[in-house]
Amino acid sequence: MMSCSKEYIDRAEQVILHTYNRFQIVLEKGQGVRLYDVEGKEYLDFAAGIAVFALGYNNPKYSQALKDQIDKVIHTSNLYYNIPMIEAAEKLVKASGLSKVFFTNSGTEAIEGAIKVARKYAYLKDGCTDHEIIAMEHSFHGRSLGALSVTGNTHYQEPFKPLIGGVKFAKFNDLESVKAQITDKTCGIIMETVQGEGGIYPADPEFIKGVRKLCDENDILLILDEIQCGMGRTGDMFACQGYGVMPDVMTCAKALGCGVPVGAFVLNEKTANASLVPGDHGTTYGGNPFACAAVSKVFDLFEEEKIVEHVRQITPYLEEKLDALVEKYDFITIRRGKGLMQGLVLEGKPVGEVVTKAIENGLLVISAGSNVLRLVPPLVITEADIDEMIEKLEKSF
């Protein structure tokens, strides 16, 4: 007799474009830090939809806010103002310390907007159209053409060339490498504050502060991608705040909506006053009342439930348990990360096999790069959840 999961998977393969090698489970519902498949099997989730579900699944106050907004209005377009967009922007500006917001539908759209901001800022200064952006090797910013162009991984890029021009790559955490790429054409430097897909590499403090200084000295815009590492994940609302570094442009998404598709790029006052104007950029769905009601409630719940404080409190316990695994197993060579964005580097044991075995054992974890086991759980995890994760993970080695 065919299982329920197998039936759904077979149907999916008939109609859904094969752009993912999906694991062979069909998830149906979630509660707290757990997901359940159509067979009723429970999974402890340390992936959080790839760092999306900061508040966990089915938070009643979050769900109610969405239901309430559905009963009012979901979409109006950017031809008009709407209250949820205003409130969400106010909260994002306050949390980030920046000045103006443009809401998008995703992280990759936010990156596209940030690239346009940098180019327009430089164009207004000198009237030239041959400006350059410096990006980082092993970075990941998205798969649309502009975002792909600043992604430092030829594997993703090669089939889609030619990409947009004027992009140069420097080594992450190597300030001299960045300096060597700067010319009078450089309009922006884009980097993740913590590299995610590249293998969970936090920026060195000296590096990110040095890049900020280079940008100030050369009137170059610093674009920080906080799509994965932002929204409390590292123990600060945004990871750059832990370094005492403010970007000119910041991109965010993922946990910004905690499941509702939404992204944003946020500008400081200098950049907002000297870049995009009406007609330069637009979106049909970006800033819609439904998505912005989600964003607004996320910020409310972060404050009400003291999410950032909890991340700071729980992080040492997670790091202690992961460091113990490094000591115990020869094939785990190092732990990297900040807050609840952690990676274990595996040597001689394929990370994909561990991820698959973990699923069998009721644990959801994911990979980063070629050999890193990535842990990006909901930010509401407890010590008991961490203990259970360690137990299930060890069974998966």
Kindly give the residue locations of the regions a language model identified.
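Conserved N-terminal phosphate-binding loop of PLP-dependent enzymes in the Aspartate aminotransferase
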Residues: 2-397
